[in-house]
Amino acid sequence: MQNQRIRIRLKAFDHRLIDQSTSEIVETAKRTGAQVRGPIPLPTRKEKFTILVSPHVDKDARDQYEIRTHKRLVDIVKPTEKTVDALMRLDLASGVDVQISLG
């Protein structure tokens, strides 16, 4: 387990939730004696939608909406058995998508 690396990718629409979750992960990993790199903020994806408001063919009346997907990356370089166990038990916010890969 000493030579492995755990890479955690987080995605969320709310930047406060993702920052809170990354701080919980980093705090848990450091408390168990692992080395942490990050959190690294990845580029935010902005998805824009334009909707016609008028029921007729009036192209001047439009509303625009956007969804921002915030992303963070955390690398745990030298995880211990305690680190893996603590991360498995960690309860994160429901609005955060977590992807974990071992490398």
Swiss-Prot record:
One of its GO terms (biological process) is translation. Keywords: Ribonucleoprotein, Ribosomal protein. Belongs to the universal ribosomal protein uS10 family. PANTHER family: 30S RIBOSOMAL PROTEIN S10 FAMILY MEMBER (PTHR11700). It holds the Pfam family Ribosomal_S10. The keyword Ribonucleoprotein applies. It comes from the Bacteria. Part of the 30S ribosomal subunit. Involved in the binding of tRNA to the ribosomes. The keyword Ribosomal protein applies. This is Small ribosomal subunit protein uS10. The gene is rpsJ. InterPro entries: Ribosomal_uS10, Ribosomal_uS10_CS, Ribosomal_uS10_dom, Ribosomal_uS10_dom_sf. GO terms for molecular function: structural constituent of ribosome; tRNA binding. GO terms for cellular component: ribonucleoprotein complex; ribosome. The lineage of its organism: Bacteria, Pseudomonadati, Pseudomonadota, Gammaproteobacteria, Enterobacterales.
